[in-house]
Curated annotation (Swiss-Prot):
Quinone reductase that provides resistance to thiol-specific stress caused by electrophilic quinones. HAMAP family: Azoreductase_type1 (MF_01216). Homodimer. Its EC number is 1.6.5.-, 1.7.1.17. This is FMN-dependent NADH:quinone oxidoreductase. FMN binds at S10.
Length: 196
């Protein structure tokens, strides 16, 4: 059975274009995988930023963790497990000031963990999360996908590749201020064309 992990990250909640787009992508995937399990995580509802306590918790052996460290590690491990168990990731990438939202960066920090999602070898890093697919819902008011102003999509593609997820598609509803209806129509066409 297919497991789909949906990651929303917009602070606009239900009004977010990226949320509408992740839903459309999810609907398209469910047409092909009607029995899929869907796991959703809304990062705007909160995800811990990594800090010294987080680092100390996840890299301390479980039997040596304090009670506080156990709680921190439990949450971090749950985020990691969601990605490990997913076959397909649907990730909202709303662009804020040319980059990704802070909460999406925090999620990436949770999943880019040495020994869990990648290892270092003599020849360089090797991602461990292979065999997965990611579909990214890229939305922006004025930043075109892939332009020199876009510091979000290349970053996310690189991070996903670093952890082993190299099958990555982008569906864009970009430059919304220059024609929201046209941007959404292009995005809808891209969703319809996705190989589910």
């Amino acid at each position: 059975m297919t497991t789909i992990l949906r990651i929303d990250s917009s602070i606009k909640g239900e009004a977010a274009v990226s949320r509408r787009l992740t839903q459309r992508i999810l609907d398209r995937l469910l047409e092909a995988h009607p029995d899929a399990t869907v796991v959703s995580r809304d990062l705007a509802q909160g995800i811990r930023q990594i800090d010294g306590s987080w680092l100390g918790s996840v890299f301390t052996a479980p039997e040596q963790r304090t009670a506080d460290q156990q709680e921190i590690a439990r949450t971090a491990d749950a985020v990691m497990a969601e990605v490990k168990e997913a076959d397909i990731l649907v990730i909202a990438l709303p662009v804020y000031n040319f980059g990704a939202p802070a909460q999406l960066k925090s999620w990436v920090d949770h999943i880019a963990r040495r020994g869990e999602s990648f290892v270092y070898t003599e020849t360089g890093p090797v991602g461990l999360l292979t065999g997965k697919r990611a579909i990214v819902a890229f939305t922006s008011d004025g930043t075109p996908l892939g332009s020199e102003l876009d510091h979000a999509s290349g970053w996310l593609r690189q991070v996903l590749g670093f952890v082993g997820i190299t099958d990555v598609d982008f569906v864009a509803a970009d430059r919304m201020v220059f024609g929201a209806d046209e941007a959404m129509a292009r995005a809808e066409a891209a969703v319809a064309a996705l190989a589910a």
